[in-house]
Amino acid sequence: MAPPGRRECAFPSRRFPGLLLAALVLLLSSFSDACEEPPTFEAMELIGKPKPYYDIGERVDYKCKKGYFYIPPLATHTICDRNHTWLPVSDDACYRETCPYIGDPLNGQAILANGTYEFGYQIHFICNEGYYLIGNEILYCELKGSVAIWGGKPPICEKVLCTPPPKIKNGKHTFSEVEVFEYLDAVTYSCDPAPGPDPFSLIGESTIYCGDNSVWSHAAPECKVVKCRFPVVENGKQISGFGKKFYYKATVMFECDKGFYLNGSNTIVCDSNSTWDPPVPKCLKGYPKPEEGILDSLDDWVIALIVIAIVVGVAVICAVLYGYLQRRKKKGNADGGAEYATYQTKSTTPAEQRG
């Protein structure tokens, strides 16, 4: 019986650990008969807040996420089974929202980057040859609220057209009366007759065409008199390209007389500046200098580096060879001493050995 003035505890301290253990066992047994949180999916989400555990037979429902829509009759719910797992369920019932269909632009193509119109993907546009794109080359399928829409207007393909090519001084081009040229339309330039004794030469491309981006393929050529001076090489002779006058792109070849060598190129061409390119060569007396050797073409520091490497290599080889000879010499001395001792032993008489 408790002493007077002291209340007796309703739950003796000895019984409290036992009651706590029993409650824990009861709680664990209730968890063992339950399912953990239900599975998560990319296309659908749980309706309501998840709980830490669910009773056997308890059902949870899902709904399609934003940007997805439901297509029956596939189930969007699951039930906690007797084996404490959730019955199989998938988000195949939820489909991505899709953007409106976009066909090929006139004179072009629309290419689905991922083969689908679903949001998050893109579509590319290209134009046929002879047309160019006006607008966005790529459109993205985006969500606006819960609706999928394209992020811009589809482009259009316009025909490549060129303005007339430039007119040139002392010349003309074909189709000069045409005001608009289409893709790959070509014109050819020619020079007018010259008023003097020397003709005009056409410098540049004679034919140009309307190309991509409505730009002509080459700059317009020019017509002017190009005449190079008569090339003379002392102690040499011309062997091809003979003529009294040398106009644009005239080509001449030379060779030197016996006992002389050519200093320069043996072939020269009259360029657009009325000069020979390369310059007219010279024939010098004697014979050409021999071509420089390998060492002549190297810098001084490279040659020094090669010499140092050779010296170091020779030193290493000599050191290895010296060490090898020294070991052979020591081994020979040791073998000679042993043979001499054996010879001495064999040459002594029995009496000497006993003495």
From Swiss-Prot:
Spans traversing the lipid bilayer: 301-321
GO terms under biological process: complement activation, classical pathway; innate immune response; single fertilization
SMART domains linked: CCP (SM00032)
Topology of the protein relative to the lipid bilayer: Single-pass type I membrane protein
Signal peptide: 1-34
Extracellular compartment spans: 35-300
Coiled-coil ranges (or none): none
Disulfide bond sites: 99-141, 127-157, 162-210, 191-223, 228-270, 256-283
Sugar attachment sites: 114, 163, 263
Domain spans labelled Sushi: 35-96, 97-159, 160-225, 226-285
Subcellular location: Cytoplasmic vesicle, Secretory vesicle, Acrosome inner membrane
Main location: membrane
Alphabetical list of InterPro entries matching this protein: CD46, SEZ6_CSMD_C4BPB_Regulators, Sushi/SCR/CCP_sf, Sushi_SCR_CCP_dom
Domain of life: Eukaryota
Record topology, Cytoplasmic segments: 322-355
UniProt xrefs under Pfam families: Sushi
Keywords, comma-separated and alphabetical: Complement pathway, Cytoplasmic vesicle, Disulfide bond, Fertilization, Glycoprotein, Immunity, Innate immunity, Membrane, Repeat, Signal, Sushi, Transmembrane, Transmembrane helix
Record remark on domains: Sushi domains 3 and 4 are the most important for interaction with C3b and C4b.
Cited function: Acts as a cofactor for complement factor I, a serine protease which protects autologous cells against complement-mediated injury by cleaving C3b and C4b deposited on host tissue. May be involved in the fusion of the spermatozoa with the oocyte during fertilization. Also acts as a costimulatory factor for T-cells which induces the differentiation of CD4+ into T-regulatory 1 cells. T-regulatory 1 cells suppress immune responses by secreting interleukin-10, and therefore are thought to prevent autoimmunity.
Protein's UniProt name: Membrane cofactor protein
Organism: Pongo abelii (Sumatran orangutan)
Gene name for this UniProt entry: CD46
